[in-house]
Swiss-Prot record:
GO molecular function term, any single one: metal ion binding
Main localization (coarse): membrane
Coiled coil residues, start to end: none
Cofactor(s) required for function per UniProt: Zn(2+)
UniProt name for this protein: Putative zinc metalloprotease TM_0890
Active site: E18
Membrane topology: Multi-pass membrane protein
Source taxon at top rank: Bacteria
Keyword Metal-binding among record annotations: yes
Principal EC category: hydrolase
InterPro entries, sorted: PDZ (IPR001478), PDZ_6 (IPR041489), PDZ_sf (IPR036034), Pept_M50_Zn (IPR004387), Peptidase_M50 (IPR008915)
Gene Ontology annotations of biological process type: proteolysis
Length: 501
């Protein structure tokens, strides 16, 4: 079924894009020979008065083939007038621009019913650090951050970027359905050390005083995979340092954001006919750890990936948090209605639950606009954010190629598969993001892409000199070869990620 979803979505997205080219070509009386979805051999075709409409085997793109577009000679004068290169540069510019424009506009139109029906996801506050600027300003667990410095908080990165400036920020939060403004000033927090100790002995308490007798505790990172003795103000801890991560000092306000909620979305079966957890059950404790929200689930997952003799430690100045790993049978306390129930399950089984999509409820809150006007405003701003983020990601990719930032057709299939398990809203959102991204991607000034053809039209409009169509088509052909190689490379990376390579 996922494959069907994937093909339908990709076909629809491509069709909208190519429809832009087709309609503008017809508007300027350019003869369209073929309107094709996909590449390769045709599955079927329908012959119109002038145009053959084709559905091809590989749904990875599409094209509108116009008369004379490939630089071929046209003997008939009447037919020649209908050819692509017989039209002025400004008309060719608009025909080429129409594809990306239709893609982007389709994304904007799709976001409106999403916003009207489901609202928009906004960052929720999962934890407030005691004594932090957030607590002092009155922020509470469960508050929703609507905007920061007049920027709608479509993503937590928007909040983080504003906070990292270190300047006072203006927050608009939603509490009990009502908006409220708060002003607070970020505070510089010291660097954080996060590390894992194997064969750990002892209990840490207070500030870290020395590492293997050295009072310069920053040397800890030099002892990965070595035995260390850590002196704390309230005790000594020994073990093998297996992992170490240093987070630099940074401005913060003292909050963490919500993610998954510790509530089961469906019945969980240990084996056929024997359920362990029921839909609606809330995890409240696992062994010695209270579970209230997303951050607790993150720590729990870390503990479940480690053995009992392993310790996770997080140090920030004089603040310390530590947990021992969990293995074997673990005690899970759940709330089911008014009842509190204890269950013993294997750590590996609980870990598998946390790893499996769509078993736990989403804890990310949604804000539904009060009226259609606000819905239009929010949907337009959401699309603007997607547009700018896509453009920024492409710019960063070409400046500093990082293969983990990009996905191809196989990767998109995985994204659509995950969205289909979540619900219609997630699927429509993915479609809107894909179609906007397709529009932006096609505007890149690369041969074979619409952006490359737009550049040729602009140059002609400025210089009033037409490049030989055959030369232009050779350039686009070479660009197409490059894009196909890039496509195959990205597909290889997608498959590698799926196989864990």
């Amino acid at each position: 079924m996922v494959i069907v979803y994937f093909i339908l979505i990709l076909t629809g997205v491509i069709m909208v894009h190519e429809l832009g080219h087709y309609l503008f070509a017809r508007l300027f009386k350019v003869k369209v020979l073929e309107f094709a979805i996909g590449f390769g051999p045709k599955i079927f075709s329908v012959k119109g008065r002038e145009t053959t409409f084709r559905l091809n085997v590989f749904p990875i793109g599409g094209y509108v083939r116009m008369l004379g577009e490939e630089g071929e000679e046209i003997a008939d004068e009447e037919e020649k007038e209908k050819s692509f290169y017989a039209k002025p540069a400004w008309q060719r510019f608009l025909i080429t621009l129409a594809g990306p424009l239709f893609s982007i506009l389709a994304g904007y139109l799709l976001f409106l019913p999403i916003t009207l029906n489901w609202g928009i996801a906004l960052p929720g506050i999962d934890e407030v650090v005691p004594g932090s600027p957030a607590e002092e300003a009155g922020l509470r667990r469960g508050d929703i951050i609507y905007s920061i410095n007049d920027k709608i908080a479509f993503d937590t990165s928007i909040i983080s970027n504003e906070i990292q400036k270190g300047l006072p920020v203006e927050l608009v939060i939603i509490r009990n359905g009502e908006k409220k403004s708060l002003r607070l000033t970020p505070r510089m927090y010291p660097e954080t050390y996060e590390f894992v100790l194997e064969s750990a002995e002892g209990t840490p308490s207070g500030k870290l005083v020395s590492v293997n007798g050295n009072r310069d505790t920053s040397v800890l990172k030099e002892f990965v995979n070595e035995y260390v003795v850590l002196e704390f103000e309230g005790g000594t801890v020994k073990g093998i340092l297996k992992q170490f991560n240093e987070i630099p000092a940074r401005y913060m306000i003292g909050i963490s954001f919500s993610g998954l909620a510790p509530v089961f979305k469906k019945d969980i079966y240990f084996k056929e006919g024997l359920f362990v957890f029921k839909k609606g059950d809330r995890i409240v404790r696992v062994e010695d750890q209270e579970i209230e929200g997303w951050q607790d689930l993150v720590v729990l997952y870390q503990r479940l990936t480690l053995g009992k003799d392993t310790m996770i430690v997080s140090l920030q100045g004089e603040n310390i948090e530590w947990w021992r790993g969990l293995s074997g049978s673990v005690r899970v306390v759940i709330k089911r209605g008014d009842s509190t129930i204890e269950k013993n399950v294997e750590a590996s089984f609980l870990k598998n639950i946390l790893e499996t999509p769509d078993l736990l409820e989403m804890g990310v809150p949604r804000y539904k606009p009060k009226n259609p006007l606000e819905a239009v405003n929010l949907s337009v701003k959401a699309c603007n954010y997607v547009l700018l983020t896509t453009a920024s990601s492409l710019k960063n990719f070409f400046r500093n190629v990082q293969t983990g930032q990009i996905v191809g057709v196989v990767g998109l299939a995985g994204v659509i598969s995950a969205a289909s398990k979540t619900g219609l809203e997630a699927v429509l959102t993915v479609v809107a993001v894909i179609t906007i991204s397709l529009g932006v991607l096609n505007l890149l000034p690369l041969p074979a892409l619409d952006g490359g053809r737009i550049i040729f039209s602009l140059v002609e409009m400025i210089t009033r000199k037409k490049l030989n169509p055959q030369v232009e088509n050779i350039i686009h052909f070479l660009g197409f070869i490059f894009l196909m190689i890039l496509f195959l490379y990205i597909t290889f990376l997608d498959i590698g990620r799926m196989m864990g390579i």
